[in-house]
A protein has these predicted regions:
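Short, conserved alpha-helix that lines the donor NDP-sugar binding/gating region
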Residues: 146, 150
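Short conserved active-site loop signatures built around small residues
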Residues: 142
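Conserved "HGTGT" condensation-loop signature of ketosynthase/thiolase-family condensing enzymes
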Residues: 1-132, 137, 151-154
C-alpha cells in the first residue's frame, strides 16, 4: 500500500480588476486596495482593464475570441508556457473555473454565453487531450477547482491538472 500522493502547486496566473498576474493581485490585496468603482449608472462594479487585456491578447494572437475567451486563453497560455506541461498529454486536464462567464454577450450573442462552449474553445485552442472540466459555482469556483484538481491527481487519473 502506498502513501498519499503529494500534490504540488505549479505555475499559476490570475487576472482580475485588481491586476494582471498573481503577484500584482496579491500585492493589491495586501495593500487593502479595492477596484470597486461607480459605473455609468452609479452601480458599483469591478472591471478588468480592457486595454491591458487587449494588449495581452494581441501579444498572444487571440483575435476573434470573445472577451472571456481572450481572458482565459491569455491567462492559461502563460501558465502552459511556464509549466512545460502540454494539454495534449492524456495525463493532463485543464480545469476552467469561472463565476459568471460571457455575460456581456447575453443580449447580442447568447450562444456565446454557454460556458460549455467556452470550455470547448479553450480545449481546442490548446489541443487538449480532454475537454476541460468546467466549474462554475459562484465565488467559490476557484477554491472548488483547486480541491477537485488535487483530488483528480490523488486518484491517479491525471498527473497535471
Amino acid at each position: 500500500m502506498g502513501g498519499e500522493i503529494t500534490v504540488w502547486w505549479g505555475p499559476d496566473d490570475m487576472v482580475s480588476a485588481l491586476g494582471f498576474g498573481t503577484e500584482e493581485n496579491m500585492a493589491a490585496v495586501r495593500a487593502m486596495k479595492s477596484s470597486l468603482a461607480s459605473w455609468h449608472d452609479a452601480t458599483p462594479v469591478c472591471l478588468i482593464d480592457r486595454k491591458r487585456l487587449g494588449a495581452l491578447a494581441a501579444e498572444q494572437g487571440l483575435a476573434g475570441y470573445t472577451p472571456l475567451e481572450r481572458l482565459v486563453l491569455a491567462t492559461l497560455g502563460g501558465v502552459v508556457a511556464r509549466s512545460g506541461v502540454t494539454p495534449a498529454d492524456k495525463r493532463v486536464l485543464i480545469v476552467l473555473a469561472t463565476t459568471k462567464g460571457e455575460i456581456g454577450s447575453l443580449g447580442s450573442a447568447p450562444e456565446r454565453c454557454d460556458l460549455n462552449r467556452t470550455a470547448e474553445v479553450v480545449g481546442r485552442h490548446f489541443g487538449a487531450a480532454h475537454r476541460p472540466l468546467l466549474i462554475s459555482n459562484a465565488c467559490i469556483s476557484g477554491v472548488s477547482a483547486i480541491v477537485i484538481a488535487a483530488r483528480l491527481i490523488r486518484s491517479g487519473r491525471y498527473d497535471h491538472v
